[in-house]
Design a protein with these regions (language model features):
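Post-HExxH zinc-binding segment in Zn-dependent metallohydrolases
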Residues: 238, 265-273, 277, 305-346, ...
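A surface-exposed beta-strand-loop module
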Residues: 83-136
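Surface-exposed beta-strand/loop patches in extracellular or lumenal glycoproteins
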Residues: 68-87, 151-170, 407, 411
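Zn2+-dependent metallopeptidase catalytic core
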Residues: 67-69, 121, 153-158, 162-175, ...
Length: 435
């Protein structure tokens, strides 16, 4: 997510939270006793059971969804999914109905301990607080923990799932922009849908064969061309410098009608969203593109590792702009850093793991973006850009499709360059102010 969006969405989300079902829950399996359902297994909770794949069908006209889910094996016989304010109507497998219950925003199912497939049918609601399907603007907004308001999911950033999507119920005069398939493990919030009067413009193709483009709205061509200038070359630079892109061979920036104050973007690879107010801003487009490597390609282990995602891609965007445009963005980054510290300084790398609610925590600010970028720049000044790039590339190769922590990146930098970044990390990431 581009840093300029943080302040806007913080205000919009400050008062919202996951809507829960009544504590008593709702029992399913079509009214059958657990002993009579397809597996004869009573519903039970297992919040940690891994979701391997989710194939979604969303009808935007009826607000009906179907999720075909594959879960990994487990020692127990239950599986649990975040369902927010979804109205779950059935849970089945190929043999028939499964026993389920919905309580506290979670769906618990009895599925057995082996790898299992199940199908959940449900209704989803309109939302207006950037926390689900935004009917007024025909957009989804699921970051950071609102995927359960659109489909059964796990919202923890470390959890990865292979996603596919089919969308129906789109007005005849509109275009729905979404990825039909995301072939590599991705955080659940990465999935997105945008419906509008979109026109596609091809920007170019990288040496690896990745087509880079932009979807813009009426009267948005000039801004789209300005913001995505040389975006194909930047994407090519990311591929050559850090490694192969894993979310397909066609990517694009998508204009998102978040309103006149909705700045920044959101890392919905391979079709990331950029607010219409930021469509002319190259930094935002380059930043969101870089999330294909850090934040999405390599997921963060904890929300407290936010700097691994946002600080790293802020640094990468600056490097890419210098490489393909000869543009120095560090003076503007310095202004952003100064403003972030003045407005509300905080520790960029907390010592806890998933102990915070990010959208209600001071960490959700420009601080991790800018302190993270300047930290990596300080490392670059010690070891040189080529050596740091080799370390970042190795880290990406070793962790792509998985979750990792900022400490693991620090360890990789030390191992690959021989330079121990601890002192710099303590000054930039674990302290108030800056060195």
């Amino acid at each position: 997510m581009a840093s300029r969006s943080a302040a806007i969405f913080l205000l919009l989300l400050a008062a919202c939270g996951l809507e829960s079902k009544p504590d008593g829950g709702v029992n399913g399996s079509g009214g059958l006793d657990a002993s009579l359902d397809a597996g004869g297994i009573p519903a039970s909770a297992d919040h940690g059971r891994d979701i391997l794949t989710t194939a979604l069908q969303l009808d935007l006209a009826t607000h009906h969804g179907t999720a075909n889910i594959t879960v990994a094996s487990a020692t127990g016989t239950g599986a649990s999914f975040e369902v927010g304010d979804l109205d779950v109507t059935s849970v089945t497998n190929p043999l028939g109905p499964l026993d389920y219950r919905v309580a506290g925003g979670w769906l618990d199912v009895g599925v057995g301990s082996a790898p299992s497939q199940l199908t959940v049918t449900y209704g989803f609601k309109n939302h207006s607080n950037f926390d689900g399907w935004l009917n007024a603007t025909s957009l989804t907004f699921l970051w950071p923990r609102f995927c359960g308001n659109l489909f059964p999911c796990h919202s923890a950033p470390a959890d990865g799932v292979q996603l596919s999507l089919a969308v129906t119920g789109v007005p005849a005069n509109k275009v729905a922009v979404y990825p039909a398939n995301i072939p590599a493990d991705a955080p659940a919030y990465m999935l997105a849908v945008a419906v509008g009067d979109y026109t596609y413009l091809k920007v170019g193709t990288t040496d690896a064969g990745t087509e880079v483009g932009v979807y813009y709205l009426p009267n948005g061509l000039a801004a789209a061309q300005t913001g995505t200038h040389n975006l194909d070359r930047a994407f090519d630079w990311y591929e050559r410098t850090y490694g192969a892109y894993t979310f397909g061979n066609r990517v694009a920036s998508v204009a998102a009608a978040w309103g006149p104050s909705g700045f920044g973007g959101m890392e919905h690879h391979p079709l990331w969203h950029v607010g219409t107010a930021s469509m002319s801003d190259q930094v935002t487009h380059y930043h969101e593109a870089a999330h294909g490597w850090f934040g999405d390609g390599v997921r963060i282990a904890c929300w407290e590792d936010f700097v691994l995602s946002e600080g790293t891609v802020s640094y990468l965007a600056a490097r890419a702009l210098q490489a393909v445009e000869g543009r120095d963005v560090w003076p503007s980054y310095q202004a952003d850093l100064n403003a972030a510290i003045t407005d509300g300084d905080t520790i960029a790398l907390p010592s806890t793991c998933n102990a915070i609610d990010l959208i209600h925590d001071p960490l959700w600010s420009n601080v991790p973006y800018m302190k993270g970028a300047f930290f990596l720049r300080a490392v670059e000044q010690q070891v040189g850009a080529p050596a740091l790039d080799r370390a970042l590339a190795k880290f990406y190769r070793e962790h792509v499709g998985q979750a990792a922590s900022m400490q693991q990146l620090l360890d990789t930098i030390h191992a690959e360059t021989g330079f121990d970044p601890t002192v710099l990390a303590n000054g930039w990431l674990r302290s108030l102010g800056h060195p």
